[in-house]
């Protein structure tokens, strides 16, 4: 497999401070540059609209990088500097799920992506 033309996306399951609170993310993705990817984060064990949802990523060998957050009541997203344009936060409150979509993937998007309450 020619890894120079592929981008590996990893997502991780995260658990809240209380054992009944869970954020379960979709599985890892392998995408080519220029493609798009949509990561899901399904919440359970709490009222979804009572807490904002944050997105954070960690590139290989790097520290955590906060990407921004989405207001789960209004659906209004706030993006950190450097994450406007190709990055889209969205929600489906009927299934308590937040989404991160990345368009026009670049090699530098290779990272582990986390949702965080």
Curated annotation (Swiss-Prot):
Sorted UniProt keywords: Adaptive immunity, Cell membrane, Disulfide bond, Immunity, Immunoglobulin, Immunoglobulin domain, Membrane, Secreted, Signal
Residue ranges, annotated region (Framework-1) = 20-44
Q: Which residue stretches belong to region Framework-2? A: 53-69
Where are the stretches annotated Framework-3? Answer: 78-115
Q: Where is this protein primarily located?
A: secreted
Question: Where are the annotated segments for Complementarity-determining-3?
Answer: 116-117
Segment forming the signal sequence: 1-19
Write down any Gene Ontology CC term: plasma membrane
Q: Which GO terms describe its biological process?
A: immunoglobulin mediated immune response
Name the SMART domains for this protein: IGv
- List the PROSITE patterns: IG_LIKE
Q: What PANTHER family does this protein's entry cite?
A: IMMUNOGLOBULIN HEAVY CHAIN (PTHR23266)
Query: What does it do?
Result: V region of the variable domain of immunoglobulin heavy chains that participates in the antigen recognition. Immunoglobulins, also known as antibodies, are membrane-bound or secreted glycoproteins produced by B lymphocytes. In the recognition phase of humoral immunity, the membrane-bound immunoglobulins serve as receptors which, upon binding of a specific antigen, trigger the clonal expansion and differentiation of B lymphocytes into immunoglobulins-secreting plasma cells.
Q: How does it assemble?
A: Immunoglobulins are composed of two identical heavy chains and two identical light chains; disulfide-linked.
Q: What is this protein called?
A: Immunoglobulin heavy variable 7-4-1
Q: Species lineage, top-down?
A: Eukaryota, Metazoa, Chordata, Craniata, Vertebrata
